Amino acid sequence: MSIKPLGDRVVIKRLEAEETTKSGIIVTGTAKERPQEAEVVAVGPGAIVDGKRTEMEVKIGDKVLYSKYAGTEVKFEGEEYTILRQDDILAIVE
């Protein structure tokens, strides 16, 4: 079984943020900022605009930066994912 997003939605898996600051201070779970970098694990077929399906700009495997509070967090088969709209993705990291 897998997650298949609909429309212009994208499923991402967050990449872990640094756990130590530059000065060597270890950051606990509650103090950590939500990471904004993730890997795309599934892509919807694209939104329908004026009767035509739009092409998705991201693909599976892309590393992306996304809006800090975007999307819906879901747990699937023991893993945590975020489902968001393609518009919430700010950039592809190359």
UniProtKB/Swiss-Prot annotation:
HAMAP family on file: CH10
Function: Together with the chaperonin GroEL, plays an essential role in assisting protein folding. The GroEL-GroES system forms a nano-cage that allows encapsulation of the non-native substrate proteins and provides a physical environment optimized to promote and accelerate protein folding. GroES binds to the apical surface of the GroEL ring, thereby capping the opening of the GroEL channel.
GO biological process: chaperone cofactor-dependent protein refolding
Principal location listed in the UniProt entry: cytoplasm
InterPro entries: Chaperonin_GroES, Chaperonin_GroES_sf, Chaprnonin_Cpn10_CS, GroES-like_sf
Subunit (UniProt): Heptamer of 7 subunits arranged in a ring. Interacts with the chaperonin GroEL.
Source organism of the structure: Clostridium perfringens (strain 13 / Type A)
Pfam short name (any one): Cpn10
Protein localization: Cytoplasm
Family the entry assigns: Belongs to the GroES chaperonin family.
Keywords on record: Chaperone, Cytoplasm
Name of this protein: Co-chaperonin GroES
One Gene Ontology CC term in the entry: cytoplasm
SUPFAM superfamilies recorded: GroES-like
Record gene name: groES
GO molecular function: ATP binding; metal ion binding; protein folding chaperone; protein-folding chaperone binding; unfolded protein binding
